[in-house]
Amino acid sequence: MSNNITIFGVGKLGVCFALNLERVGYSVLGVDIHPKYVDSINTKTLKSSEDSVESMLTLANNFTATTDVDQGLEFSNILFVLVATPSLDNGKYDHSQIDRLANQLIKRGRQETTKDLIIGCTTMPGYCDDLQDRLERYNYNVSYNPEFIAQGTVIRDQLYPDIVLIGSRNEESANKIKGVYERLVENTPVYSIMSPISAEICKIALNCFITTKIAFTNMIGDLATKVGGEPQSILDAIGADQRVGSKCTNYGYGYGGPCFPRDNRALGVYAKEQDCSIHISDATDECNADHLQFMIDNFEGDEVIVEGVTYKPQSMMIEESQQLAYAVGLAKKGVKVTLIDKPEVLSEVKSIYGDLFTYRD
């Protein structure tokens, strides 16, 4: 198998994947549409909030970037795609960046050598099969290989996955992807190989299972709090049962961030389209919202300090942050709220909420 790998889209996730691949001996070419960003990679001046990215880039000898799609195609027959697929207002994922790349590939005609196009971003179930139908005549094998990572620990999460999920119609393609990970990872993950649509369902369903567990945890915690019980003692006992497990059973803030909420909604939307309502998807979102309101309603006092308003520690993202939503809810009911976080985070919050809070870094 070739030692060269091309990655289309070297943003927060893609650049980490590129650096991890380079570290284990691959030559990696990143293709991105932003010239200044590409320059920052090639000049090793990229600034990143992800742990180890800047130091790994400084040491990397075989990772470069370009804006040239043709160069990316010529460099390797293994093409990973890690562009953004943000959520649309209807709850589905926006595939426009993948579609834009696919149209560019189609314009370049049929490839002499079969190329593996590996979609690593989250897609709606059925999308990769549709993409395969569009690209098959141009000699592409489309596979699906999403990553289960968390913002702030992407480098480590890619090296120590619990599961490597591969969706492919082609056994040879699936084995190529597996081979990349066998060289990359530093643990012994489960390799789950299935059809693309199965993998697409699996990706969002796995995250939805976690959101449901978090919502259930907080629901029981709220109930215990209301009747004078001991929330965490109850939850620790529940988590001690091996059928449940102790992960995600700490009573506290609900789920938020760029992945869990949108995956939960997307699964519900997709199921309804198939006339297979997954009521638990809607119920989980409702429980998450109810828990936030419970926390706000049960706060007693005139002032509070909220330390850390990103959706999770070691992240710079405030997207659907329950910590921030809690602070907003308290401030709107007259509580004096002081926020403590990194200057960059506070600057973003202040640009949205102005003088609603007192800010302290």
Which residue stretches match the model-derived regions?
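Structural/interface elements that position substrates and couple domains in central-metabolism enzymes
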Residues: 2-361
